[in-house]
Every structure is written in structure tokens, then in C-alpha cells.
From Swiss-Prot:
Gene3D superfamilies: Nucleic acid-binding proteins. The modification 3-methylthioaspartic acid is found at D89. Pfam families: Ribosom_S12_S23. This is Small ribosomal subunit protein uS12. GO terms for cellular component: small ribosomal subunit. Belongs to the universal ribosomal protein uS12 family. The gene is rpsL.
Length: 141
């Protein structure tokens, strides 16, 4: 426990907050090149083949980033935009690839529907707004 005089002279040291996405260097997004596109299996209670890519960022750091949505067109040497945000059941995956920018195309619709266009959560998957003349999706009865 410091004395009052020591506190007057030095003061207390502020606790530094650790960043959750250190490879971005305090930037909201970073551009990068896909080095390898692969699938990973999630942690214990879950089972799937999650699509991920190893990306070399413009600052020279290599990270593993998740490819959200269903279906993708990424391959080696694709240019992508990476944001922070971890995937809870994939250890070591702390970044997401932004769909609909650079070489990453927008996602197609969910597989539990028979339509190929995504109408909900479009902004998260880089899907453009449907044309005004297009017929609306049929409602299940």
C-alpha cells in the first residue's frame, strides 16, 4: 500500500485495456489477401465444417478469418476486407470477412428455403436490395 506522499509523486497506474482484435492495429477494418481457404470443425457440442480463410493483412500480419453466410467465391489470392469479431465455437478465429466488398461476393439465401436470394439480414451478407418489380417471396401456409 503506497503512502499519500508516494501517490502525490507518482500517482496510480491506469489499467490498459487489451484489444480483442490486435492484428487490425486500432483500425475498424483491414484489407488482406487470402493465403489459404479451408474448413474447420467447431468445439465440442457443435458439429459442422465452418469455412475460414488464412489472410495476410496489409500490415503484414496473418490471421484466420471466418467467411459468414452460405456459399462463397473466395480462393487463394482473393482480396478481402477483414473486420474484428470472433466466432465462439472456433478457437483462434477472431476476425470476420466482410461479404459484398472487394473479391468477396454477397451470400446466397439460407438453405432451408428454396429461393436463391437472401431477403433478411441483407446488410450483414452483402446482398443488394431486390428490384421493385420483382415478385415477393411466397408465404408458407
Amino acid at each position: 500500500m503506497p503512502t499519500i506522499n508516494q501517490l502525490v509523486r507518482r500517482g496510480r497506474e491506469k489499467l490498459k485495456r487489451k484489444t480483442k482484435a490486435p492484428a487490425l492495429d486500432s483500425c475498424p477494418q483491414r484489407r488482406g489477401v487470402c493465403v489459404q481457404v479451408m474448413t474447420r470443425t467447431p468445439k465440442k457440442p457443435n458439429s459442422a465444417l465452418r469455412k475460414v480463410a488464412k489472410v495476410r493483412l496489409t500490415n503484414g500480419k496473418e490471421v484466420i478469418a471466418y467467411i459468414p453466410g452460405e456459399g462463397h467465391n473466395l480462393q487463394e489470392h482473393s482480396i478481402v476486407l477483414v473486420r474484428g469479431g470472433r466466432v465462439k465455437d472456433l478457437p483462434g478465429v477472431r476476425y470476420h470477412i466482410i461479404r459484398g466488398t472487394l473479391d468477396a461476393s454477397g451470400a446466397v439465401g439460407p438453405s432451408n428455403t428454396n429461393k436463391l436470394n437472401r431477403n433478411v439480414s441483407r446488410s450483414k451478407y452483402g446482398v443488394k436490395r431486390p428490384k421493385a418489380g420483382a415478385k415477393p417471396a411466397s408465404k408458407a401456409k
